[in-house]
Structures are given as C-alpha cells and as structure tokens.
C-alpha cells in the first residue's frame, strides 16, 4: 500500500513524509484488536496515525487515545492526519521515546512494532529508525507496556510469524499471558506470514484463531470483509 496517500471510509491518510507506509498488517491489527471497556488507549510508534485513527473510529466519544512517535516527520504527518479526521479532540500525538515515556496507566496498548533484525540493509535512515529492532527491541517494548498498562490492561501487536514466536516466548518468561493468537495467511492455502497477539498480565487460556485475507482468485475473503469492511472504501466477496 505504497503511494503518498490512502483513503478510508471515515478518514484519510497522507504518508509522503513517513518512512513506513500504511500496510495490511496495521489494518488487520486495528480491525482485530478488542476495544470493549478501554477508556485510555496508547499507540506505540504511531507513524502515520493509522492505528490511533482506526481505534478512534471503533470506540466511544469519551475514549482518549495517545499516539507516541519518535520521528519528527512522522509526528507532524500524524498530527495533520488526525487534525483532518473526525476525532481530533480525542487523539493526542506525542513525540517521545516510549522507553522513558510517563503517563497515567492505559487499558489498552496497541503497536505495529519494529521487526527488522540487526544487519539488514534498509533504504534510508528514517526507515531504519522506524523498523530496526535496535531502536525498540522486544524486551524494551514489553517492559514499556508493562509499566504503562493497568493491572487488567491488554497489549495488542502484529508481527511476522517468527518474530511473533520469539516475542511470545520472551513475554511468557516475563510474566505475560497470551490471551489470543491469530495467524494470518495472505492467500488461502498459503502458510501464515503474520501473527496477531493479545497479551495481558493476568492468567488466561489462549484462544487460537486463523484469518485468511484473500481467496485463491485474489478476492477478499468473507472473514476479512467482515473484519475490515467498516474501514475499506471498497470490499466485495
């Protein structure tokens, strides 16, 4: 989903100054993450603001959303995208390193976190900052979330499958519990390449799920349409 902009049913994303563009991974995460009962939400590494905007669309007027981002160009673009949306009064964009960010506790934290490993060559410095695990590794992400969540709060993430397995192992060792795991296949019959994770600090049995995005003929699958139709301008089975 490259290009300089992306239009959804209720909001528009400009992304010409953001290193990481709107992708299916964020759209799936923003559609899948449970928001019931959440009064305060934190988006870690907001980028264009896509996840903050999706959750604003899905939640009641009194829900407050903080969107934290380190890159100054992404912060400016996220602010512009949010200010042009119907939810500008509910979303606050904050330029800060999440590792030292302080705020009242959140009921829900959502993130499409860094997932490139050390040694990978990336096109430019901004993209490297946005996606290099040296900037926010899994340990730092989990520690930040644990510090900022309420006791019953939840952490929702999307990662490539292998990185997701690594994070679950790390989280389990650190006292987290995996509530839900959804393996995502881009096309029917292909091996999953993404995983959606919902973690909490309270004991829970893991719900295992599977999501297919497209059929073999490249049409959106019925389950993906049911999940994301409130956002996409055009989806048809």
UniProtKB/Swiss-Prot annotation:
UniProt GO MF annotations? nucleic acid binding; tRNA (adenine-N6)-methyltransferase activity
| PROSITE patterns attached to this UniProt entry | N6_MTASE
Q: Which CDD domains match?
A: AdoMet_MTases
PANTHER family in alphabetical order: TRNA1(VAL) (ADENINE(37)-N6)-METHYLTRANSFERASE
Identification of the protein by name: tRNA1(Val) (adenine(37)-N6)-methyltransferase
Q: What subcellular locations does the record give? A: Cytoplasm
Provide the transmembrane region boundaries. none
* GO cellular component, as recorded: cytoplasm
Q: Does the keyword Phosphoprotein apply?
A: no
Tell me the HAMAP family matching this sequence.
Answer: tRNA_methyltr_YfiC (MF_01872)
Its family remark reads:
Belongs to the methyltransferase superfamily. tRNA (adenine-N(6)-)-methyltransferase family.
Entry EC no(s)? 2.1.1.223
Which reaction is recorded as catalysed by this protein? adenosine(37) in tRNA1(Val) + S-adenosyl-L-methionine = N(6)-methyladenosine(37) in tRNA1(Val) + S-adenosyl-L-homocysteine + H(+)
Tell me the keywords, alphabetical order. Answer: Cytoplasm, Methyltransferase, S-adenosyl-L-methionine, Transferase, tRNA processing
Q: What does this protein do?
A: Specifically methylates the adenine in position 37 of tRNA(1)(Val) (anticodon cmo5UAC).
Tell me a GO biological process for this protein.
methylation
Claim: Lyase is one of the keywords in the record: no
């Amino acid at each position: 989903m490259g290009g300089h902009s992306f239009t959804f049913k209720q909001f528009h994303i400009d992304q010409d100054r953001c290193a990481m563009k709107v992708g299916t991974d964020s759209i799936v995460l923003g559609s899948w993450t449970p928001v019931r009962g959440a009064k305060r939400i934190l988006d870690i590494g907001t980028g264009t603001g896509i996840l903050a905007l999706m959750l604003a669309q899905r939640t009641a007027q009194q829900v407050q959303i903080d969107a934290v981002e380190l890159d100054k160009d992404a912060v400016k673009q996220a602010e512009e995208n949010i200010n042009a949306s119907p939810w500008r009064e509910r979303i606050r964009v904050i330029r800060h390193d999440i590792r030292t960010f302080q705020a009242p506790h959140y009921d829900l934290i959502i993130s499409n976190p860094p997932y490139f490993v050390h040694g990978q060559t990336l096109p430019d410095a901004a993209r490297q900052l946005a996606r290099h695990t040296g900037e926010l590794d899994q340990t730092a992400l989990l520690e930040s979330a644990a510090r900022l969540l309420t006791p019953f709060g939840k952490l929702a993430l999307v990662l490539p499958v292998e990185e997701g397995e690594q994070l679950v192992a790390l989280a389990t060792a650190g006292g987290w519990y995996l509530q839900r795991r959804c393996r995502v296949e881009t096309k029917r019959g292909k091996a999953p390449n993404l995983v959606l994770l919902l973690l909490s600090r309270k004991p829970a049995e893991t719900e295992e799920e599977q999501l297919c995005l497209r059929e073999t003929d490249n049409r959106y699958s019925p389950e993906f349409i049911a999940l994301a139709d409130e956002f996409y301008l055009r989806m048809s089975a």
